[in-house]
């Protein structure tokens, strides 16, 4: 495969994921490995959910907003020192809680995509608050040694306003991005604008192109088109402004298909060799310039290697990437390299894994590992989770076997989050409360009764 030009790891530090909880040395190691596989750009998004503006801090406190902001600034500095291009990703009218004055808040009726802590940018005070806050963050980042190459905007998740003045939203958002770009150039004069097409409709692409070509020609240098779940390319026929290069927004936080409830790794690490290889081939064939790889942390480590390794032209197939991955991180040689690649690939469709065989093969392969670390341990966690889940659902009624297996499942999942991935207070869609086994509610209602019985 030939290399795609722009290969961004979009790693939002939020919701208690690895990127939020990691120390500097861990971020550095992660980015060094990202570079090894082939990424050449790094992006983060300051998700304001539940946070005050960290710069609105008259008492000089160091609370959650300040801690998260320091994490992000440090990650950007590390990325720049390592030679990565840097992207400041914004959903511009999603703001901090202390900006949410009732008279300038957005309207969110009529479109399910409109959500978040939103201000109306058509209200002058709302627009001023948005622009001043973003410029303040960028200035603080620069003052503390950071550098940003691109400001990258997304209109949804979070974002939107349905008031008459903001309709159509995609145009209001586009003008807001242009204004933000002007503000950002006061801090970083050479900064350029990229866009993300997550959740855009075909009609919005048409509207945006007509507006941008007329009102903002040449401003937007690329647009990462949305690849929907289980697809391997953006919707054909999307139109872009003149001079705006086609890129893709690639979700690496699930397996080959989104058929199991473990998006974002709530049931263990993820792997999508067929989906990612076909995606890269499609992007190359259809003339795409690059991509933004949406990652939520350690669980998609293999998928990072797959996407970067293939899209950089370093490896010609997913199988070759997986062999290199096993050799690099498991310290193995010879025939075991191919066996590990085959074992890992089997988890691309987790519901089809023969758990008895997978356990036998894993125990044999693990014995040959010379450098065990978290990248290996996370896969044993995944195997254990599916083993315990299988023991539960094999029971025709809730009995001691089911209760014990369920307890082991819950313990293993917590251990994976805390001891293996070193996660913090995991929040929102990354929390496994949204992807519980079908038996979990029954377990909650029954396990105390079984525990009391066993103590009698």
What are the residue ranges of the model-derived segments?
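Catalytic domains of carbohydrate-active enzymes that cleave complex glycans
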Residues: 281-289, 298-300, 312-456
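Transmembrane beta-strand segments of Gram-negative outer membrane beta-barrel proteins
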Residues: 5-9
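Catalytic-core regions of glycoside hydrolase
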Residues: 12-16, 26-28, 35, 40-47, ...
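Contiguous, structured surface segment used for ligand recognition
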Residues: 1-3
């Amino acid at each position: 495969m030939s290399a795609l030009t722009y290969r961004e790891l979009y790693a939002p530090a939020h919701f208690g994921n690895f990127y939020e909880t990691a120390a500097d040395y861990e971020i550095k190691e992660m980015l060094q490995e990202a570079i090894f596989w082939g990424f050449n750009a790094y992006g983060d998004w300051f998700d304001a959910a539940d946070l005050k503006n960290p710069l609105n801090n008259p008492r000089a406190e160091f609370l959650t907003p300040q801690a998260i902001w320091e994490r992000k600034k440090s990650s950007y500095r590390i990325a720049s020192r390592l030679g990565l291009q840097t992207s400041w990703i914004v959903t511009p009218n999603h703001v901090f809680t202390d900006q949410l004055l009732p008279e300038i808040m957005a309207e969110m009726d009529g479109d399910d995509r409109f959500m978040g802590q939103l201000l109306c940018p058509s209200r002058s005070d709302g627009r001023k608050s948005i622009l001043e806050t973003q410029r303040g963050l960028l200035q603080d980042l620069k003052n503390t040694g950071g550098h940003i190459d691109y400001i990258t905007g997304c209109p949804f998740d979070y974002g939107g306003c349905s008031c008459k003045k903001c309709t159509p939203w995609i145009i209001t958002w586009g003008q807001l991005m242009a204004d933000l770009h002007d503000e950002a150039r006061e801090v970083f004069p050479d900064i350029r604008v990229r866009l993300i097409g997550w959740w855009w409709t075909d009609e919005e692409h048409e509207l945006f192109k007509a507006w941008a070509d007329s009102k903002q020609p040449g401003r937007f240098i690329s647009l990462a088109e949305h690849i929907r779940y289980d697809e391997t390319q953006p919707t054909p026929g999307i139109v872009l402004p003149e001079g705006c290069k086609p890129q893709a927004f690639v979700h690496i936080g699930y397996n080959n298909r989104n058929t199991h409830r473990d998006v974002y790794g709530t049931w263990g690490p993820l792997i999508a060799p067929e989906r990612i290889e076909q995606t890269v081939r499609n992007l190359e064939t259809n003339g795409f310039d690059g991509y933004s790889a949406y990652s939520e942390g350690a669980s998609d480590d293999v998928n990072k290697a797959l996407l970067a390794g293939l899209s950089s032209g370093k490896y010609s197939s997913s199988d070759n990437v997986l062999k290199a991955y096993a050799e690099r991180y498991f310290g193995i040689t010879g025939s075991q390299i191919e066996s590990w690649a085959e074992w890992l690939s089997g988890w691309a469709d987790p519901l089809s894994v023969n758990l008895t065989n997978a356990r036998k093969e894993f125990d044999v392969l693990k014995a040959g590992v010379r450098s065990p670390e978290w990248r290996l341990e996370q896969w044993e966690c995944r195997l254990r989770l599916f083993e315990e889940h299988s023991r539960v659902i094999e029971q025709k009624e809730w009995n001691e076997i089911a209760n014990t297996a369920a307890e082991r499942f819950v313990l293993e999942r917590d251990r994976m989050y805390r001891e293996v991935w070193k996660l913090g207070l995991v929040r929102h869609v990354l929390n496994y409360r949204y992807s519980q086994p079908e038996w979990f509610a029954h377990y909650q209602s029954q396990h105390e009764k079984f525990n009391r019985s066993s103590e009698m």
